[in-house]
């Protein structure tokens, strides 16, 4: 019987899950799915790697299933349907590890308390990321819970790339540029090594374009600079997040529009970005297909900001060898890729129209000085690998894995 690792990625209204089985030195996906519609009409959907339906269940809306109850049902489902006695650990995506956690960590109540102090730095994500950990610690305390952070990958950046021009005491207090989407960038860097070793060992800019969007300059697999900083609201305009903003705007809003910190937070995180500019939608698919002038303006601003950040990140790399598009928009919006690459012709970018329309693999021409790739990300697999490696490196012959097997068997 093979060991299994469960990966959880909790959002505000859903818990996404993936189960991986050990196959020698590799991890094979066994199932994936989510419980969506939390606090409304919750629904569990589980699928096999070939996308065939494994299980489906809907709860009455009046139950208003929350994160804790959803995780209870998920654990029950795993135990009943996928031999959960093999489960040796749970890996969790956690957006912010601060300056304290620069790699995966096994979470206990003490670590959980520290992670809760980072909630103000990632208010849209961190509270929901931590809820399943808290529930799992209470229900299966002997089963290892491993937190994997979106901030860790960026700790290889030079000091100047992580600094704000603020007094040293504030920097020492942890006010710095952390960067995010690190699990995605780490996966892309690893995958690019397999697909294009020359590009992977050179200077690459990865565009993680989704409802949350950022860009990262990577050299020889290491983060050099990124567009997100202290929080995940900086950088590119996103679905509902503003992206870069003159701090003076915030002071002005507070002084002249009587906005308090909660008002400003709500504005920057939930009312701005593509939604705020367009007045139509936060969904890029809707905006691309809309004739509304506001929608067209939002798309134009999104591409313009990417154009500026490409130049900035290419400068940080002293040149450019490859561009990779990933995440929901990056992997599925040929129009955005075409506009971005058209604006990057000065860097030596030239894409093949047919390859771009197909949207998989290398989409640049044979004569392009910069290789351009479309690579779907897989943060869940990255978390599973980190979890297994952490358990392997932090065990004795009678250590964590044996405890986990014993705990899972008796759960």
Cite the ranges covered by each PLM segment:
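Glycine-rich phosphate-binding loop of actin/hexokinase-like ATP-binding domains
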Residues: 153-253
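Internal helix-turn-beta structural module
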Residues: 296, 300-321, 330-399
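Phosphate/pyrophosphate-binding loops at sites that engage ATP/ADP/AMP, CoA/4′-phosphopantetheine
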Residues: 76-88, 192-198, 310-321
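Catalytic phosphate/nucleotide-handling subdomain of diverse soluble enzymes
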Residues: 219, 224-260, 266, 327-358, ...
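Glycine-rich beta-strand-to-loop/alpha-helix junction loops that act as flexible
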Residues: 10-11, 93-96, 209, 320, ...
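Adenine-nucleotide phosphate-binding core of ATP-dependent small-molecule kinases
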Residues: 266, 273-277, 284-316
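Short glycine-rich, Thr/Ser-proximal phosphate-binding strand/loop in the N-terminal lobe
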Residues: 5-7, 14-63
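Short beta-strand-loop/turn "lid" adjacent to the catalytic site in phosphate-handling enzymes
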Residues: 77-125, 144-146, 152-163
């Amino acid at each position: 019987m093979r060991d299994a690792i469960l990966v959880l990625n909790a959002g505000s209204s859903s818990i996404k899950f993936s189960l991986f089985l050990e196959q020698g030195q590799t991890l094979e996906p066994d199932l994936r799915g989510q419980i969506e519609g939390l606090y409304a009409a919750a629904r569990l959907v589980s699928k096999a790697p070939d996308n065939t339906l494994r299980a489906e269940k809907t709860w009455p809306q009046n139950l208003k299933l929350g994160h804790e109850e959803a995780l209870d049902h998920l654990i029950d489902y795993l135990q009943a349907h996928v031999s959960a006695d093999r489960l040796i650990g749970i890996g969790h995506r956690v957006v912010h590890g601060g300056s304290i956690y620069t790699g995966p960590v096994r979470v206990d109540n003490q670590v959980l308390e520290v992670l809760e102090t980072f909630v103000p730095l990632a208010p849209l994500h961190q509270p929901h990321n931590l809820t399943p950990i808290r529930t799992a610690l209470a229900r299966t305390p002997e089963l290892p819970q491993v937190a994997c952070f979106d901030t860790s990958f960026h700790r290889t950046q030079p000091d100047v790339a992580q600094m704000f021009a603020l007094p040293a005491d504030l920097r020492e207090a942890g006010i710095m540029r952390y960067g995010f989407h690190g699990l995605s960038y780490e996966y892309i860097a690893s995958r690019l090594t397999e697909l294009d070793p020359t590009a992977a060992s050179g200077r690459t800019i990865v565009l993680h374009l989704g409802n949350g969007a950022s860009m990262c300059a990577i050299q020889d697999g290491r983060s050099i600079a990124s567009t997100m900083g202290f929080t995940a609201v900086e950088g590119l305009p996103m679905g509902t997040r503003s992206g870069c903003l003159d701090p003076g705007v915030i002071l002005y809003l507070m002084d002249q529009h009587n906005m308090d910190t909660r008002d400003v937070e709500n504005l920057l995180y939930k009312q701005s970005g593509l939604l705020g500019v367009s007045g139509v939608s936060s969904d890029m698919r809707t905006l691309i297909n809309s004739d509304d002038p506001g929608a067209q303006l939002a798309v134009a601003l999104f591409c313009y900001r990417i154009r500026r950040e490409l130049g900035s990140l290419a400068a940080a790399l002293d040149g450019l060898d490859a561009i990779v598009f990933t995440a929901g928009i990056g992997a599925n919006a040929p129009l955005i890729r075409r506009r971005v690459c058209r604006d990057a012709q000065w860097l030596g970018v030239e894409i093949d129209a047919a390859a771009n329309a197909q949207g998989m693999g290398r989409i640049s021409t044979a004569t392009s000085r910069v290789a351009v790739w479309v690579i779907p990300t897989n943060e869940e697999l990255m978390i599973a690998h980190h979890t297994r490696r952490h358990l392997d490196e932090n065990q004795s012959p009678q250590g964590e894995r044996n405890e986990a097997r014993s705990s899972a068997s008796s759960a």
